[in-house]
Every structure is written in C-alpha cells, then in structure tokens.
C-alpha cells in the first residue's frame, strides 16, 4: 500500500473518530473504538449479569467495586459501582466504564494476566513498558512474571500502591462456562480508610464470593458442583 493511500485511510479514520492524534503527532485509538468494544461487551451480557452483584458488594463494603476485562496490555473498565464514602474520591482517578489502565500495575490486570496461557502472557509482557506509576510499581518484567505466578497460586491479586500512592485494591477472577477467566472484579480503597491486610482478610472473601456469583451467572460450575 502506498504512503499516500495509507495517509488517506488514516485521515478518514481520524475523521470518523477511530483514530486520534496526540501532541507528539503520533496516532492512537480513538473513543469510537472503545464504543465498539463496549457494544460488544454489552452483547455478551457480562455487564448485565454483574451489575447487581457489584452494587451489593459496594453496599456491603462501602468501597468502590469494579469489573474489568483484558484488552491487549490494558484493563478495560466494563462496569463500576462507585462508593461516595469520604476518602474514596482521593483514588477515583476519574474512572468510568470505557476507561483503560495498564494491566501490569492494577489488581484486575494482574489476575487477568496470571490466568493467560504462558506463551500469550510472555508475549504481552514483552510488549509492555513498565513505567513507574506509584511507590511500589513493579518495573522489572522478571519480577512481574514472578508476581503473576504467586497471583495464580493465591487465586486473587493485590495492588499495594502500584498504580498510585495510597491506593490499595484486591481482585478476583470471573470465569465462564468453559472455565476460562474472562473478567475480573476488584475493590479499591484509600490507605487512610483501611490497611491492606484488613482489605484482604476482612473483605477478600466477600470479593471472591461476588466473583463466583457472577461466574455462576455465566455458566461456570466448580468441580464439586458438576
């Protein structure tokens, strides 16, 4: 394809909102692409199946609860039950359904990466630039792979100020009928509200139960239920 033809296609995609040009003059995916992805997710029923359970956990815990899926090297936020408790606004980060965050420094991203086939996981990590976001961001790819091994063994993921200072979160996997991990649920809190240990020990079981209920709505059954 000639350069002039490619340029015409790019200009057309920009005009339609599927590409946008940043200050560096490099192109990135536009909001229309996110709209397409959200429409596809709506068609699967994932948001509809999860919404009631997310809201129930928000009420029970008084913390913000999120549902996300892996999209390339990012976590795409699919649904969000936002807490209005004092202090939660400090870690809100302006997130909403359709928002994206790097998978490597989020609890949902880590649980989703940990459950990928090994070769696919290595390819994705190879594409990542592990930029420091918070005080404890993992910036070594080997350290990230080691962390993901621990996450897989534990069955849940923890974010200890890896995305931003004072932000704690924990995440659990959502599985479908084929037993594949297709999404993740997480709960986030400011460090002034609860310790990470309390978040894991006191609220972790409720988070896992919520993820299990959503999984059941998607047709997943544990071995002892088959």
List PLM regions with ranges.
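N-terminal helix-turn-helix
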Residues: 1-48, 212-220
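Short amphipathic alpha-helical/adjacent loop interface patches that line ligand
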Residues: 3, 10, 33, 54, ...
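Residue-level recognition of specific faces of alpha-helices
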Residues: 12-18, 32, 66, 77, ...
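Cysteine/selenocysteine-centered motifs that mediate thiol-based redox chemistry or coordinate metal-sulfur cofactors
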Residues: 120-123, 128-129, 208-226
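Intrinsically disordered, low-complexity polar/acidic regions
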Residues: 133-135
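Amphipathic alpha-helical effector-binding/dimerization core
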Residues: 28-127
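Extended hydrophobic
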Residues: 137-213, 226
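Short, ordered coil/turn segments that flank beta-strands lining enzyme active or ligand-binding pockets
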Residues: 23, 71, 177-178
């Amino acid at each position: 394809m000639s350069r002039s033809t490619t340029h015409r296609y790019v200009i057309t995609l920009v005009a339609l909102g599927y590409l946008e040009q940043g200050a560096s003059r490099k192109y990135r995916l536009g909001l229309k692409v996110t709209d397409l992805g959200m429409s596809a997710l709506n068609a699967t029923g994932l948001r509809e199946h999860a919404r009631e359970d997310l809201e129930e956990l928000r009420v029970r815990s008084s913390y913000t609860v999120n549902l996300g899926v892996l999209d390339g090297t990012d976590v795409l936020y699919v649904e969000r039950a936002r807490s209005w408790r004092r202090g939660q606004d400090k870690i809100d980060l302006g997130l909403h359904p359709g928002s994206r965050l790097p998978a490597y420094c989020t609890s949902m991203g880590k649980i989703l990466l940990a459950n990928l086939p090994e070769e696919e996981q290595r390819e994705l990590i190879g594409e990542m630039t592990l930029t420091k976001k918070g005080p404890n961001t993992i910036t070594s790819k080997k350290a990230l792979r080691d962390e993901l091994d621990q996450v897989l063994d534990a069955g849940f993921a923890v974010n200890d100020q890896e995305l931003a200072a004072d932000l704690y979160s924990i995440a659990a996997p959502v599985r479908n009928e084929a037993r594949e991990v297709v999404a993740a649920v997480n709960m986030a809190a400011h460090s002034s509200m609860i310790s990470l240990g309390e978040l894991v020990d006191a609220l972790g079981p409720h988070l896992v139960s919520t993820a299990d209920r959503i999984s059941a709505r998607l047709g997943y059954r544990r071995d002892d239920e088959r």
